[in-house]
């Protein structure tokens, strides 16, 4: 079959277009080669992207060596950590759709044949994934890689707010969340807070724990759309250079197979099937990934026209054990430790041994996932290439440069009984790291990262404390108005109600800093940062702005949460709920809106709110809401 690009490069009538292509550097010999789009997300605003500036051209040169033509463009990238806790967070989730659209626009406008996605942080990988599945042309995902964990002498500053002693005897490992928690703890001096702040984020790369960015970059491996090591190999390590070069070679091979051999098995929709989405979700549950991944996998499946819904996630969550507890669930381990233990393919191998994966699926780099697992499982001592890749260690030097160090661990972590990654027989818990809860407060579901919930509060009953903005909830926590036994409810913060479905990292972090991390719960129709832990339940659907029952909860109502049985209910009769709904509906134009909230919402955000949907659908866009 013809290359897509022939539309703009072939025939007499395209002389004008070819003239413009020539002005970009193309020559006679380039017409007829596959044109590969490189979607780079370099920006100096985001540590996960600050090192990407020259990497697109590195991939481009490799594409050209392999017989393709490379054309790079950029997308935006929002740093959720910098946007957190103020009106900037309203823009984070909407940026996902903007990124997806921008990739679609550039690829389709210029008739590109294939796509390399250079992503990294929270909404960029999901946005590019949505675009890739929408476009359905050959694609390779290559992320910028994780940040090294921060490290500081444990005896000198701060204290651990985690579920276990994380000092390791001498060194306390840090990340962004530690800086936030300790800053809110009045018992820690300004000097100590400054020292922690200066140490928490030492290098370029996506934040160092199993937060949203790293979770999503791991899931692209499980979907079969990224190379082994993509989710865990540090941004600073020289071995990551080879992943970028391999991405360039791989995409040309995929493009030629698609167009010259008419092989549709290389297309993203042929790879990211329902079985592949189930594999990705199984991995997500086993590694205790961010709850945001649920939102993004649902949205990606929607773009792929795959029937993958919340009930599938609920079903999977009941049968997958927790095989990894990584920050924020445990400060003992960060992504550098996951990599040392074999990364994503170590987890996939353990899940395969437990009979929990479908491995008869293609990937961009192997005929089947089974073949890939057999090659990249470090538990096989004969897998020398895998063992060499996963020995990559942190450099321990502050830097914003990619590939700037080549340190190695003295040994791999192959301890599947008590190491970072466990076998199913030695799982952290039989119940996985994510769960979907249902009940009269969230009829279409809500989600919780169970890997971060202490066993003592898996079943919790408390009184509702109602807030209609994140800011008001934060103020109440910091003013000591929240006490043990409270269920903090933050509503009208969903995709429509916010708009933009803000992350609630500050409220949960401040609860922990006040010593209430095991004494309170938080429920919202908004969402949580991947850095959140504790009894933090988000994505309540339908959201309050769409008539969800979370909008009917009243101050002092009793809320019962039962994670083992997957339920969440307000202990209010059906009759009382019906009466409350009738009263709410009677408010006319003021119904299902915050009673009093002063928030500027720009036209761009109003447009997003007009078309978005609740979290149980992935907060995807539904243009029928505005079509006439």
Curated annotation (Swiss-Prot):
User: How many and how are cofactors bound here?
Assistant: Binds 1 [2Fe-2S] cluster per subunit. This cluster acts as a Lewis acid cofactor.
Q: What is its EC number?
A: 4.2.1.9
Kindly list the GO CC terms recorded for this protein. cytosol
Q: Where's the active site on this chain?
A: 529 (proton acceptor)
Its keywords, alphabetically, are: 2Fe-2S, Amino-acid biosynthesis, Branched-chain amino acid biosynthesis, Iron, Iron-sulfur, Lyase, Magnesium, Metal-binding
- What cofactors does the UniProt entry give for this protein? [2Fe-2S] cluster; Mg(2+)
- Reactions catalysed: (2R)-2,3-dihydroxy-3-methylbutanoate = 3-methyl-2-oxobutanoate + H2O; (2R,3R)-2,3-dihydroxy-3-methylpentanoate = (S)-3-methyl-2-oxopentanoate + H2O
Question: What sort of enzyme, by top EC class, is this?
Answer: lyase
Instruction: Write down the SUPFAM superfamilies for this protein, in alphabetical order.
Output: IlvD/EDD N-terminal domain-like, LeuD/IlvD-like
Q: Molecular function (GO) terms listed?
A: 2 iron, 2 sulfur cluster binding; dihydroxy-acid dehydratase activity; magnesium ion binding
Query: Where, by residue number, does Mg(2+) bind?
Result: 80, 122-123, 503
List every position bearing N6-carboxylysine: 123
Q: In which pathway does it act?
A: Amino-acid biosynthesis; L-isoleucine biosynthesis; L-isoleucine from 2-oxobutanoate: step 3/4; Amino-acid biosynthesis; L-valine biosynthesis; L-valine from pyruvate: step 3/4
Q: Which residues bind [2Fe-2S] cluster?
A: 121, 207
A GO BP term, please? isoleucine biosynthetic process
Q: Which family does it belong to?
A: Belongs to the IlvD/Edd family.
* Role: Functions in the biosynthesis of branched-chain amino acids. Catalyzes the dehydration of (2R,3R)-2,3-dihydroxy-3-methylpentanoate (2,3-dihydroxy-3-methylvalerate) into 2-oxo-3-methylpentanoate (2-oxo-3-methylvalerate) and of (2R)-2,3-dihydroxy-3-methylbutanoate (2,3-dihydroxyisovalerate) into 2-oxo-3-methylbutanoate (2-oxoisovalerate), the penultimate precursor to L-isoleucine and L-valine, respectively.
Subunit organization: Homodimer.
Task: Please name the HAMAP family in this protein's record.
Answer: IlvD
Q: What is this protein called?
A: Dihydroxy-acid dehydratase
The source organism is: Psychrobacter arcticus (strain DSM 17307 / VKM B-2377 / 273-4)
High-level lineage: Bacteria, Pseudomonadati, Pseudomonadota, Gammaproteobacteria, Moraxellales
């Amino acid at each position: 079959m013809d290359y897509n690009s022939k539309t703009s490069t072939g025939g007499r009538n395209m002389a004008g277009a070819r003239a413009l292509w020539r002005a970009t550097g193309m020559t006679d010999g380039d017409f007829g080669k596959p044109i590969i789009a490189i979607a780079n997300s370099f920006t100096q605003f985001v540590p996960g992207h600050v090192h990407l500036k020259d990497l697109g051209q590195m991939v481009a040169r490799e594409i050209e060596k392999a017989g393709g033509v490379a054309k790079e463009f950029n997308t935006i990238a929002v740093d959720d950590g910098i946007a957190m806790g103020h009106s900037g967070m309203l823009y984070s989730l909407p940026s996902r759709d903007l990124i997806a659209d921008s990739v679609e626009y550039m690829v389709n406008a210029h008739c590109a044949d294939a796509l390399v996605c250079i992503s990294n942080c929270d909404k960029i990988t999901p946005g590019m994934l949505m675009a890739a599945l929408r476009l359905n042309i050959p694609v390779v995902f290559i992320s910028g890689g994780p940040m090294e964990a921060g490290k500081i002498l444990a005896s000198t500053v701060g204290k651990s707010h985690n579920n276990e002693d994380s000092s390791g005897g001498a060194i306390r490992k840090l990340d962004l969340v530690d800086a936030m928690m300790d800053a809110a703890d009045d018992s820690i001096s300004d000097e100590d807070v400054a020292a922690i702040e200066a140490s928490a984020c030492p290098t370029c790369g996506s934040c160092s724990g199993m937060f949203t960015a790293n979770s999503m970059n791991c899931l692209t491996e499980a979907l079969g759309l990224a190379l082994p090591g993509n989710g865990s190999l540090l941004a600073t390590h020289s071995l990551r250079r080879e992943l970028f070069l391999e991405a360039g070679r791989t995409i040309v091979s995929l493009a030629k197979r698609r167009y010259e051999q008419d092989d549709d098995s290389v297309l993203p929709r042929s790879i990211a099937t329902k079985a592949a989405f189930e594999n990705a979700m199984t991995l997500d549950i086993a590694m205790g990934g961010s709850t945001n991944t649920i939102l993004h996998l649902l949205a990606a499946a929607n773009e792929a026209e795959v029937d993958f819904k919340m009930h599938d996630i609920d079903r999977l969550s009941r049968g997958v054990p927790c095989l990894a507890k990584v920050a924020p669930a445990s400060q003992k381990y960060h992504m550098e430790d996951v990599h040392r233990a074999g990364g994503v393919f170590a987890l996939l191998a353990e899940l395969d041994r437990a009979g929990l994966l479908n491995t008869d699926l293609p990937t961009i780099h192997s005929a089947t996932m089974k073949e890939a697992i057999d090659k990249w499982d470090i538990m096989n001592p004969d897998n020398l290439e895998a063992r060499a890749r996963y020995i990559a260690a942190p450099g321990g030097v502050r830097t914003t440069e990619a590939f700037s160090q080549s340190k190695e661990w003295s040994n791999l972590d192959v301890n599947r009984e008590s190491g970072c990654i466990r076998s199913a027989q030695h799982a952290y818990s039989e119940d996985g790291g994510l769960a979907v809860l249902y009940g009269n407060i969230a009829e279409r579901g809500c989600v919780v990262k169970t890997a971060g919930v202490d066993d003592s509060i898996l079943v919790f009953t408390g009184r509702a404390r109602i807030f209609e903005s994140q800011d008001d909830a934060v103020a109440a926590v910091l003013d000591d108005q929240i006490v043990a036994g409270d269920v903090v409810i933050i509503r009208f913060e969903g995709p429509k109600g916010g708009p933009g479905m803000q992350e609630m990292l500050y409220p949960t972090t401040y609860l922990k800093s006040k010593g209430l991390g095991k004494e309170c719960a938080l429920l919202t129709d908004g969402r949580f940062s991947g850095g959140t832990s504790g009894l933090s339940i988000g994505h309540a659907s339908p959201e309050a702005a769409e008539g969800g029952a979370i909008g009917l909860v009243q101050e002092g109502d009793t809320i019962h949460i039962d994670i083992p049985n997957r339920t969440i209910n307000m202990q209010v009769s059906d009759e009382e709920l019906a009466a409350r709904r009738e009263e709410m509906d009677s408010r006319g134009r003021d119904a299902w809106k915050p009673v009093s909230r002063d928030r500027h919402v720009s036209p761009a955000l109003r447009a997003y709110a007009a078309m978005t949907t609740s979290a149980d659908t992935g907060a995807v866009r539904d243009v029928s809401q505005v079509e006439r």
